[in-house]
């Protein structure tokens, strides 16, 4: 087997789209059945990756003309203790199995971090598929998340808010601006640019809904992204700027009690939701969420 030094390393271009998509499909085991379930066709999902190659830095390793390993760095901003920093979000990390174990990914990471430093990015982030691997490469866990399961009888019933909830389109401006406002006041939150929003929705089913809570002055103060399937409400994301919006969203969830048996969702480690329940005997699971490392302390 060749060593990492014997391969070619370069940034991918749009001409590499077919190989880029093939490596992603193989590594993350995206089947035709899964594409159909989410409403995608193979050519559509491939074409949807064009913006990634155009607006993100995708570094690849080639054995001859064949792409064998890659990862993408999305240019984002992050709120860290009320200061906004430029960060590189590493994603789409993948290598064909026959090329693992010989230092390719380590070399790609070094080159990627070096480029981030040149571009003035302060931090690098990723969602790990292997915590020990990234520990070995110098990354550390920086956040956790709580996954929760709530029975329909445990949904808060004694909550009410003076405002109202409306379902809106995925590209609704108030919805996007509300997330930006939330990010501006929340430590550890990423600001989403157009590319990040595209990735946010990539694998969501068409029946996924966005519900926004408005106060009595018609100001959006919270939202939830959710899907109802097989009598379960799956909450992808729920944020709120104040307690009123939080209560309003839970009131909205309770309005679905005749349609659902359970609520499944995720929340921040610092915000356990058992305290919000009339019956706090719910299932909550804490797991590591994101890993990060400092790129530049200047």
Predicted feature locations:
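Short amphipathic alpha-helix that is part of the acyltransferase structural core
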Residues: 2-75, 82, 89, 155-195, ...
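Conserved acetyl-CoA pyrophosphate-binding loop and the N-cap/start of the following alpha-helix
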Residues: 99-111, 244-248
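Conserved GNAT acetyl-CoA-binding A-motif
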Residues: 109, 114-128, 258-268
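Conserved active-site alpha-helix within GNAT-family acetyltransferase domains
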Residues: 118-122, 128-146, 248, 270-286
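Amide-forming acyltransferase catalytic core, primarily the GNAT-like/NAT-type
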Residues: 144-236, 243-247, 251-256, 284-298
